[in-house]
Amino acid sequence: MATSHNLPAEPGTAPVGCLAPGTITPMRKVPADIVRPEYVGKPTANEGNDSNMYTPEEVERVRAAGRVAAGAIVEAAKIAVPGTTTDQIDVLVHEYICDHGAYPSTVDYRGYPKSVCTSL
């Protein structure tokens, strides 16, 4: 069985057929020029205003965010094979989102350290 100190660095090369506990790596940095959501660094998030009305500019921003998110899912799916660790998927998604000028929305949401929430 693999242990946290000998998991492979390359996607698809971890032992197959069992789940092994890994090490939770530190929160990855987001480039300083990427705008942070209001919840970053706070223990709780604001409830919001429950408004479903968006300006045309806001609609375009939501569409752009959706395109980045869809691209991140496509890239993650390419390496989501037996032997790939969830941390390897997180690295790929984090870099993809940041490279597209966006903030990985789960990073530092109520202290969550990752760009991806993964279930096994």
Tell where the protein language model's regions lie, with residue ranges.
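Active-site neighborhoods and metal-handling regions in enzymes and metal-associated proteins
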Residues: 1-120
